[in-house]
């Protein structure tokens, strides 16, 4: 995708915008993989987005049929992974503010060596996040 391809609500400074990594439709950069369909920053206001990336490749998820599962890929799979990690963080540190959470994510993501408009702070590292 082209720069400036992150859309609302992801362009907000207050939103944690999650990109997708590790998919079969990927671009190899060194040893790191970034999907070639995940939106790229910056925003029109020159805000670096996405904030971070998380795995979103071939994730088992609920299907619309009763008692069924399906395999999906994309930021719709990456974002719940980050949300779950944040829930674990807030369980461990319940007094954290939204700013604290964003700062902690920023400090603990693993740099993939990609441009910031593709990876933001880097790849979610749950183990480091919860230390």
Question: Predicted segment positions?
Answer:
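Short acidic loop-to-helix transition motifs that present clustered carboxylates
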Residues: 1-3
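Extracellular S/T/G-rich loop segment that most often corresponds to the catalytic His/Ser-adjacent loop
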Residues: 7-91, 128
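C-terminal subdomain of the subtilisin-like protease fold in secreted/lumenal serine endopeptidases
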Residues: 91-131
